[in-house]
């Protein structure tokens, strides 16, 4: 049922090769020269957002972040290290890295993703419409 709901809501977006602002480092393919030029993943993002930061730097350097439906993997987020929500120290680290991402790349740049429709909700992961269409410009 969830898969059917996703297909209806995303209008088959996930079946299309397309540009994204960032993808997960769990499945990231990048030219060595680009990785080296940008000095790889920023180790100051010890757990969270190192992939997002890297992708944003790749994009700022003039390269594209391309997502393809033809690569398939299973990624169990936080499976090996556990949830950040249940551990106050992990939660604090996550929150600090979140704020650092805003500081490095600008809050507005993060919140106004050029590859994500402003008519879609940021509160859900299933491409449902935003309840506040005033955000459209």
List where the protein language model places each region:
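Glycine-centered small-residue hotspots that permit tight backbone geometry or close packing
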Residues: 1, 40, 77-80
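Active-site-adjacent helix/loop segment of glycosyltransferases
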Residues: 59-137
């Amino acid at each position: 049922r969830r898969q059917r709901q996703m297909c209806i809501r995303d209008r088959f977006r996930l079946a299309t090769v397309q540009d994204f602002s960032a993808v997960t480092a769990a499945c990231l393919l990048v030219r060595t020269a680009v990785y080296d030029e940008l000095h790889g993943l920023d180790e100051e993002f010890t757990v969270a957002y190192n992939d997002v930061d890297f992708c944003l730097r790749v994009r700022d350097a003039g390269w594209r972040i391309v997502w393809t439906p033809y690569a398939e993997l299973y990624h169990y987020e936080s499976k090996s290290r556990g949830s950040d929500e249940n551990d106050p120290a992990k939660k604090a680290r996550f929150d600090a890295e979140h704020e650092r991402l805003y500081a490095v790349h600008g809050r507005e740049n993060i919140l106004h993703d050029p590859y994500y429709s402003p008519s879609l909700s940021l509160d859900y992961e299933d491409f449902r419409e935003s309840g506040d269409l005033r955000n459209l410009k």
